[in-house]
Amino acid sequence: MAYIFDTNVFIRSKHEMPMDLWPTFWKKVAGMINSGDVFSSIQVKGEIDKGGDELTDWMKDNAPVGFYVENEPDVMVKYGEVMNWAQSNTVYRPEAISEFAQVADAYLVATAAAKGYALVTNEIADPTCKRRVKIPDACNALGVRYCGLNDVLRELRITI
């Protein structure tokens, strides 16, 4: 199984496992990326690049061509399905749907659905949340598997 990583997985890892203190962890992440087990969305690249920090530099050094999945036609078809689901869900406020459409989240769900990836995120499902569309809720609606980083490490039998 291949995995697609949410921006928050990289950012939270940067904060909780700084590169200077956890070099083995970051080498293992680079190994997962280079083995073709892990991908991300081109929208995630944009979000990480905005940071302009050591994570931005690390990603430039470790993300090979093809790591960031482009918004190909199959992804855009699924993106339409994701957005139709969000817009038809009466729980969400209009600003929540607008934000969901503009950040990487909807594209991540669409890419996972189109490519058969499991989506890796730190978010937790909350189908009653009005102010934000949560990735796990969108995954559940589209039948996409989601999990956390530790699940991926276990499934790929990676230890630090």
Identify the residue ranges that each predicted region occupies.
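Short, well-structured N-terminal submotif of metal-dependent ribonuclease cores
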Residues: 1-61
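Residue-level detector of structured alpha->beta connecting loops
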Residues: 37, 113-116, 143
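Short, surface-exposed acidic-centric catalytic microdomains
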Residues: 44-85
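Acidic, PIN/NYN-like endoribonuclease modules and their adjacent C-terminal/linker elements
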Residues: 118, 124-160
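Exposed alpha-helical structural elements
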Residues: 21-24, 28, 54-58, 74-81, ...
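Conserved beta-strand scaffold positions in the cores of enzyme catalytic domains, especially
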Residues: 38, 66-69, 146
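Active-site neighborhoods of divalent-metal-dependent phosphate/nucleic-acid chemistry enzymes
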Residues: 74-136
